[in-house]
Amino acid sequence: MNLYLLLGALAIFSLVYDKKENSIFLYLLILFLVFIIVSPAIISKNTESTVEDIPSHKAKSVRKKLEIEQALDAILNKNTSSID
């Protein structure tokens, strides 16, 4: 959120600052520089993912089977405890 606020503020600043001249060039230059400066921080933040953050099709099916087994075990344990 702060990144978008910063980019918006810089865009408005660049348009106001260079209003008399060709402001599009300065606007694009500032946005490009901010993107180059901020992109390594965004990329390094996203590299700390684990296997659970990126589930594959196989991992999803295994997790679903495990949840079903746990639910069935809970039902069976409830039924056997009431018989005893």
Swiss-Prot record:
Q: What does this protein do?
A: Plays an essential role in budded virion (BV) and occluded derived virion (ODV) development. Participates in intranuclear microvesicle formation, ODV envelopment, and subsequent embedding of virions into occlusion bodies.
Q: Which keywords does this Swiss-Prot/TrEMBL entry list?
A: Host cytoplasm, Host nucleus
Q: Signal peptide location in the record?
A: none
Coarsely, its chief localization is host cell
Report if keyword Transport is assigned.
no
> What name does UniProt use for this protein?
Protein Ac76
Protease: present as a keyword of the record? no
Q: Which gene encodes it?
A: Ac76
Name its cellular compartments.
Host cytoplasm; Host nucleus
- Extract one GO cellular component term from the record: host cell nuclear membrane
Quaternary organization: Interacts with protein Ac75.
Q: Which species is the source of this protein?
A: Autographa californica nuclear polyhedrosis virus
